[in-house]
Amino acid sequence: MTSRKPASSKRAAPPRASDSAKSFRKDWERLTRSGRYDMKRLKEAMLLLIANDEPLGPEWLDHPLKGDWADHRECHIGGDFLLIYRTDGDTIIFVRTGTHSELFEE
């Protein structure tokens, strides 16, 4: 016998739209060519962000940024490998990816 779920428990919002900044696309190509970083794990984080309306779980160390990056969030893909993103309404925009020194040194 199968249990029936009420209709309200089956409803969900559609996934967010996504976009990426030119700087993110350049970072992606550079990091993919280097072979030093787990791009599949980065893609996993991106898909979770697109599919959910909430910040990532604690294992991603997802947090808001301050200063010049005040309207952005950062998550740790692995070690010092980071993803910087922001939301604009129902759209998530991937801004940069790389290490702390690559992203925050002037």
Predicted regions and their residues:
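Basic, Lys/Arg-enriched alpha-helical interface segments
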Residues: 1-79, 87-93, 101-106
